[in-house]
Regions:
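Bacterial signal peptide processing site
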Residues: 30-32
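Terminal connector regions
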Residues: 38-42, 138-192
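Asparagine-centered strand-capping/turn motif at beta-strand->loop junctions
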Residues: 90-97
């Protein structure tokens, strides 16, 4: 009798444990579904305002090279690759003045222009950010892809932060890294560091 009572108690705890595991699994699926929502509509390119550029008013600016990776090799062979989604981020760090972005070009490994991402000069307000996204299926840039970003300003300003973030969550593995931009050329007065 004691053994039967112990078995019933054990079966009860097993059932409760299975129900609890099911509930936790269901909650995890719901949480995962929430993380795949599209970004808010106010993010990205919508923070830019098209402007007419008057070159005589330009006081400072830069041309910035930003290395990006469409994919990377893994394991011990170049036959195995992980595709990466890329976000180019341009952040105006000046507290008072806007910058004007004049060029955002995307190049492949051989230095061939793939596409111009900016049609017209566009103003980025003080402390605002703009981003450009390339999906993980966009592999035409190759391992040595890059962006060339040009910006100018009508005031002496703090230089913007321009960088690329590469991400992959392929096969349940999370991989991400940042690639900072490198200034190739100063236009006009050098900006404060």
């Amino acid at each position: 009798v004691l053994q039967k009572t112990a078995m019933r108690g054990l079966n009860h705890w097993i059932k409760l444990s299975l129900i609890l595991i099911f509930i936790v699994s269901l909650a995890a699926c719901t949480l995962d579904a929430q993380t795949t929502q599209p970004p808010a509509p106010h993010l990205g390119k919508s923070t830019l305002k098209q402007v007419t550029l008057e070159s005589k008013k330009i006081l400072a600016g830069q041309t910035i090279y930003v290395p990006v990776y469409s994919y990377i090799y893994h394991y011990d062979t170049q036959n195995q690759v992980i595709n990466l989604a890329t976000t180019l981020s341009i952040r105006n760090t000046d507290l008072k003045h806007p910058i004007i972005i004049t060029k955002i070009d995307y190049y492949d490994t051989s230095g061939k222009l793939i596409k111009n991402l900016l049609e017209n000069p566009s103003e980025l307000s003080s402390m605002a950010s703009a981003d450009y996204f390339l999906s993980r299926n966009e592999v035409s840039g190759g391992l040595g892809a890059n962006f060339l970003v040009e910006w100018v300003a009508e005031h002496s300003i703090f230089e913007p932060v321009v960088e690329a973030v590469m991400v992959s969550t392929e096969s349940g593995r999370g991989l991400s890294f940042v690639s900072p931009g490198k200034v190739l050329k100063h236009i006009g007065a050098k900006t404060p560091a």
